[in-house]
Design a protein with these regions (language model features):
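Feature captures hydrophobic
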Residues: 1-109
Length: 109
């Protein structure tokens, strides 16, 4: 299980579910705050993913979250809907892409 944001970023391509992304064309911006935070984005295009550090000028969705909470989310210790409802997870942009996010990545084992 990843313990740092860098480990999450490095593991994303391996956790990616290409079948769930067929026909998709979207950019997810991640603004991870606090200790160990980072800014990175994923470009998803028809079943392929590219993970890049930094910011994208025109993402379809921006996800903002504290680094510790994001790692808990990735590791299955924090429910995404509960995180959103409690304000730990902030979403700006296309909400339907947020709903699809869970199917795009296999659970971390």
């Amino acid at each position: 299980m990843p313990e740092t944001i860098q480990e999450v970023i490095q593991g994303m391509p391996g956790q990616f579910n290409a079948d769930a992304a067929k026909g998709m064309n979207a950019v997810y911006q991640y603004d991870i705050t606090g200790d160990g935070g980072a800014q990175f984005y994923t470009e998803i295009k028809d079943g392929a993913i590219a993970v890049k550090e930094g910011t994208n000028p025109s993402p379809n969705i921006t996800i903002t979250m504290n680094a510790k909470d994001y790692i808990d989310l990735v590791n299955g210790k924090l429910n995404g809907q509960m995180a959103f409802m409690s304000g730990k997870l902030k979403i700006k942009g296309d909400m339907s892409l947020a709903m699809k996010l869970q199917s795009l990545f296999r659970p971390v084992a």
